[in-house]
Swiss-Prot record:
Substrate binds at residues 69, 77, 144, 174-175. InterPro entries: Beta_hexosaminidase_bac (IPR022956), Glyco_hydro_3_AS (IPR019800), Glyco_hydro_3_N (IPR001764), Glyco_hydro_3_N_sf (IPR036962), Glycoside_hydrolase_SF (IPR017853), NagZ_Beta-hexosaminidase (IPR050226). It comes from Neisseria meningitidis serogroup A / serotype 4A (strain DSM 15465 / Z2491). This is Beta-hexosaminidase. Keywords: Cell cycle, Cell division, Cell shape, Cell wall biogenesis/degradation, Cytoplasm, Glycosidase, Hydrolase, Peptidoglycan synthesis. Its EC number is 3.2.1.52. The gene is nagZ. The record marks 185 as: Important for catalytic activity.
Length: 361
């Protein structure tokens, strides 16, 4: 069978279960679509996951990019057969107790294990690290954050990024310019952060600035309003994305929207309007999760935005290790020692409980 050549479009969609339905295959063949995000509902075991990713990648060329939220703690979509990853605040605790060097070493090991295990299963990208500061206000962020100190967050995220790269994956910092100060969960409401730009610059923006300088591949903006800067949520704001992130910070990588079905995005109108505003604000790729009907509505008479960099940016997010090479790494003694080390961080301080993030129920 001839595999159709279809350039990757600017929409990342999802699927319902363990295998593709015929309807989903047709949806993923649409030129509007360029990637697939997987969730816990798509995982039964490692063998099934490998079959699913191979099925997705066999649909078209260039292959669809496959992503997942696999941060550690309560945001780890695949459990059985994978190393249990600690929540990132465990690294902050190591930073405070044992010093920066010990915490950075642990972060590199976590990134390596995280990325290599996913790479072996045909996954291109995990949406990590979380660069939000832990102000103690936001339950949906909470222990997903490394620390409250911007320097600690930046250094631990950079160490994690080095581990991810060793395992074949790029990094995606989120949620620009910072979701940690607000109380609301943008999956459920549209939060507001009333601080000034200078206050944000002094704290929350620092990790994004440092990581941009150090090769962070992608950014995901927050569905949060910062009214002293713009009345629009950051993901819909040209001020935040084109002026502050691109021009002032100098970020040159990929901008993924957060899920456009989240409540924090719904005030912008229907799905076509949300996507249009996201693209105009500066997003390269939009996520539409848990609502295949909205993906279909969006792709109906869809006009692909003029973005000459899109193909290159998509390709930049593709896995660089490959499943066979990753599987070979997993068999080595060094990697198995890293797995044991990482599992040891998670076991006594397991933080999988708490607010659930981004799953459909």
């Amino acid at each position: 069978m001839t595999v159709p050549c279809i350039p990757r479009g600017p929409v990342m969609a999802d699927i319902a279960a363990f295998r593709l339905t015929e309807e989903e295959k047709q949806r993923l063949l649409d030129p509007a679509v360029g990637g697939v995000i997987l969730f816990r509902r798509n995982f039964q075991n490692i063998a099934q996951l490998k079959e699913l990713t191979a099925e997705i990648k066999a649909l078209r060329t260039p292959e669809l990019i496959i992503a997942v939220d696999h941060e550690g703690g309560r945001v780890q979509r695949f459990i059985e057969g994978f190393t249990r990853l600690p929540a990132m605040n465990v690294l902050g605790q190591i930073w405070d107790k044992d010093g920066a060097s010990a915490a950075e070493t642990a972060a590199r090991q976590i990134g390596w294990v995280l990325a290599t295990e996913l790479s072996a299963c045909g996954i291109d990208l995990s949406f990590t690290p979380v660069l939000d500061l832990d102000w103690g206000n936001c339950a949906v962020i909470g222990n997903r954050s490394f620390h409250r100190n911007p320097e600690a967050v930046a250094r631990l995220a950079l160490a994690l990024q080095k581990g991810l790269e060793k395992g074949g994956m790029k990094s995606c910092g989120k949620h620009f310019p910072g979701h940690g100060f607000v109380e609301g969960d943008s999956h459920l409401v549209l939060p507001e952060d009333g601080r000034s730009l200078s206050e944000l610059e002094a704290a929350d923006l620092a990790p994004f600035r440092i990581m941009s300088r150090e090769g962070m591949a992608a950014v995901m903006p927050a569905h949060v309003v910062y009214p002293q800067v713009d009345t629009k949520p950051a993901g819909f704001s040209e001020i935040w994305l084109k002026q502050i992130l691109r021009r002032d910070i100098g970020f040159k990588g990929v901008i993924f929207s957060d899920d456009l079905t989240m409540e924090g995005a719904c005030g912008a109108g229907g799905i076509k309007e949300r996507a249009r505003i996201s693209f105009e604000a500066g997003c390269d790729i939009v996520l539409v999760c848990n609502r295949p009907d909205l993906v279909d509505e969006l792709r109906d008479d869809f006009r692909i935005p003029d973005n000459p960099a899109l193909a290159q940016r998509w390709q930049y997010m593709a896995n660089t290790l490959g499943s066979a090479a990753a599987q070979a790494v997993i068999q080595t003694a060094d990697f198995q020692a890293a797995q044991a080390f990482v599992a040891g961080l998670a076991s006594p301080q397991d933080t999988a409980g708490g607010v659930k993030v981004g799953e459909a129920f």
